[in-house]
Amino acid sequence: MAGHSQFKNIMHRKGRVDAVRSKVFGKLAREITVAAKLGTPDPAMNPRLRAAVLAARAENMPKDNIERAIKKACGGDAETYEEIRYEGYGPGGAALIVEAQTDNRNRTASDVRSAFTKAGGSLAETGAVSFMFDRVGLVAFDAKVADADTMLEAAIEAGADDVKSDESGHEVTCEQSALGEVAKALEARFGEPRRTSLVWRPQNTVEVDDETGEKLIRLVEMIEDQDDVQNVFVNFAVSDALMAKLHD
């Protein structure tokens, strides 16, 4: 999670989300539709749908778009998407997990493989790197909702396993089976979280030099640019100097 979160910060600082807003909205809408189709179309009764709606709000997705994506799941013409996980390696041996939703497995596999190859990485078999990660629940809040000690105390009471707090916010992690209850307890105290989801958290984060870091960031960008890709999780971290460079 640390490596993934750090990279996400880079993405926001560079403004890439604004540059590809229609693509971002398309991916968010797809997850909303899939979540609504798999469960009930009521976010209050469907934890995955609620998480998808929260993610959409965090990206300032218009309310009409969100409602349209939910209604699409209720219609008979909604596409059927298959959820697939890909695993691979990047420059320097860094590990990546890619989550995708697709209506054409062959197309998506080809696109993801091409992105890995073009950026100096290699797609591996499922299970090749996932053992280096833990599947956990994540509940994220803005820093302003509480200080670090207050959040830690509340998270422990809610049944969470760990909390990371800094100026960018609070990230509470828990067993994946406990995500719903932990999120509900924390929301009752601090209000709506900015994100609730299941993530792949690296057991160990690998520090890479700036040259390798730039190559890895390019790889992740190329993978995330694929329409069918929903999430990319990594086990690397880049230097503060490279972060500052990318921020400029």
From Swiss-Prot:
UniProt entry keywords in alphabetical sequence: Cytoplasm, DNA-binding, Transcription, Transcription regulation
* Pfam hit, one: TACO1_YebC_N
- Segments passing through the bilayer: none
GO CC annotations, alphabetized: cytosol
**What GO MF terms are annotated?**
DNA binding
A Gene Ontology biological process noted in the UniProt record is: regulation of DNA-templated transcription
Q: Where in or outside the cell is it found?
A: Cytoplasm
Family, similarity comment: Belongs to the TACO1 family.
Q: What name does this protein carry?
A: Probable transcriptional regulatory protein Mnod_7401
This chain's source organism reads Methylobacterium nodulans (strain LMG 21967 / CNCM I-2342 / ORS 2060)
